[in-house]
Amino acid sequence: MSDGLDNEEKPPAPPLRMNSNNRDSSALNHSSKPLPMAPEEKNKKARLRSIFPGGGDKTNKKKEKERPEISLPSDFEHTIHVGFDAVTGEFTPDLYGSQMCPGKLPEGIPEQWARLLQTSNITKLEQKKNPQAVLDVLKFYDSKETVNNQKYMSFTSGDKSAHGYIAAHPSSTKTASEPPLAPPVSEEEDEEEEEEEDENEPPPVIAPRPEHTKSIYTRSVVESIASPAVPNKEVTPPSAENANSSTLYRNTDRQRKKSKMTDEEILEKLRSIVSVGDPKKKYTRFEKIGQGASGTVYTALDIATGQEVAIKQMNLQQQPKKELIINEILVMRENKNPNIVNYLDSYLVGDELWVVMEYLAGGSLTDVVTETCMDEGQIAAVCRECLQALDFLHSNQVIHRDIKSDNILLGMDGSVKLTDFGFCAQITPEQSKRSTMVGTPYWMAPEVVTRKAYGPKVDIWSLGIMAIEMVEGEPPYLNENPLRALYLIATNGTPELQNPERLSAVFRDFLNRCLEMDVDRRGSAKELLQHPFLKLAKPLSSLTPLIIAAKEAIKNSSR
């Protein structure tokens, strides 16, 4: 009898998703050659000295040092002229474009682009309808400037390592006294370092989602591109002499050289940031929860407060881009908010850097959206918390640039916090728009895909896509070829919902405000916090049953 009463009093279980979705080393025999061999570098210099006699070796060396060094060309680009024949529906050499650049021959579509297009599933009709969008996504995919830097401070489940970097170091008045500046490095040293980096460059790593919902295309990508021609009042390149301006880490050889810091300089900078002392005396009960390319993640307890924290331990000798760690720490340290997974502390322990962050035991929102069904009240609660985080970041001139369910962490109490600042970009009034292709393709805003200058509202578009994730369990176009997905993002406007009639009018209006193609008409974080949809938000504690149900479903599926 009592058992029957207990069963009646238990709330129904949350609804689950049914388908959780080498060079030639042989030496030349010069003696057999009828022609004289090419003079070596030293012989060239000796001959030049005989032609232009100086005082002595020391004088010549001094003069050589005084001569201005002419660097290799940088930031150059190969302009490809491609036209489109509306009759045949084929991409052709653009004769007019070639005439605009004297000396250039018409090239037509490059072979690698043609191969990409053949496997893209973009139909001939779609190519004919919007050839420029096709070219935009082809340029993005064929870029050789893509980099795969670690997001060092990533603390999400499984210690995911994704493709990303801090695009700008903090430059607010709070941090102006300690900008992570990098002194110039000599050309010879830098070339050697660059060769070593190229040889040791790890292969690209796919950013993870839960195994049962993972797509090979769901990864974060970064492409450094030339800024489009825009009025100076809108975009002004940051001045190298202005210590308070944001210096962008553009992915070019010359700028990588300028941003070099020696290991000793990095250690000196880190010593000025980290806390003094032994973290093993402050934290106890270390438990390993993840291992990644950039380090190992543990949970631990703060002895003084009893707070559970996440600690990432990184061997600095194994980090290829150590200066980016400094930038990421500084960005996180200066942007603390209740809706952000906050940086707590850091320590140098031997050759390791230990970074202490808040720990949220509920896991990522991805687990909830792929394993359970959320109602509008729960979705509104998550959107409100994310908008509060974005309003804070945007008001501090920070764009997150990688908003998606993977980067939203949940506490067991239902708290919602934004994490993963490996892509975040700081902007100043002079640098009010950015034009770097960055983020995860399926969550990208159209202005990013089409390589236009953009601002904080790219995060709002991504939030709208994440809201669709919460409804449907995945973002739009996830099962499309990535090239076609980018084409659809660039051309379709607001993505269509599978069953829009199931959503309330106020929710559909919220989605339309987030997913407005016209950036000027798209809502800002501050504006959307006043949207009527958020009044439907349930208490955050309503998320707890979903978190528990998702954990159970994942545990059962792994058996």
From Swiss-Prot:
Binding site for ATP: 289-297, 312
Regulation: Activated by binding small G proteins. Binding of GTP-bound CDC42 or RAC1 to the autoregulatory region releases monomers from the autoinhibited dimer, enables phosphorylation of Thr-436 and allows the kinase domain to adopt an active structure.
Residue positions of the active site: 402
Cellular compartments annotated: Cytoplasm
GO cellular component, one term: glutamatergic synapse
Biased composition (Acidic residues): 186-201
Listed SUPFAM superfamilies: Protein kinase-like (PK-like) (SSF56112)
Pfam families: PBD, Pkinase
Enzymatic reactions: L-seryl-[protein] + ATP = O-phospho-L-seryl-[protein] + ADP + H(+); L-threonyl-[protein] + ATP = O-phospho-L-threonyl-[protein] + ADP + H(+)
Entry keyword set: Allosteric enzyme, ATP-binding, Cytoplasm, Developmental protein, Disease variant, Intellectual disability, Kinase, Magnesium, Metal-binding, Nucleotide-binding, Phosphoprotein, Serine/threonine-protein kinase, SH3-binding, Transferase, Ubl conjugation
Gene3D superfamilies hit by this protein: CRIB domain (3.90.810.10), Phosphorylase Kinase, domain 1 (3.30.200.20), Transferase(Phosphotransferase) domain 1 (1.10.510.10)
Record PTM Phosphothreonine, positions in chain: 436
In-chain residues carrying the UniProt-annotated modification Phosphoserine: 2, 50, 154, 186
Enzyme class, spelled out: transferase
Matching PANTHER family: SERINE/THREONINE-PROTEIN KINASE SAMKA-RELATED-RELATED, SERINE_THREONINE-PROTEIN KINASE PAK 3
Disease: Intellectual developmental disorder, X-linked 30: A disorder characterized by significantly below average general intellectual functioning associated with impairments in adaptive behavior and manifested during the developmental period. Intellectual deficiency is the only primary symptom of non-syndromic X-linked forms, while syndromic intellectual disability presents with associated physical, neurological and/or psychiatric manifestations.
Biological function: Serine/threonine protein kinase that plays a role in a variety of different signaling pathways including cytoskeleton regulation, cell migration, or cell cycle regulation. Plays a role in dendrite spine morphogenesis as well as synapse formation and plasticity. Acts as a downstream effector of the small GTPases CDC42 and RAC1. Activation by the binding of active CDC42 and RAC1 results in a conformational change and a subsequent autophosphorylation on several serine and/or threonine residues.
Protein known as: Serine/threonine-protein kinase PAK 3
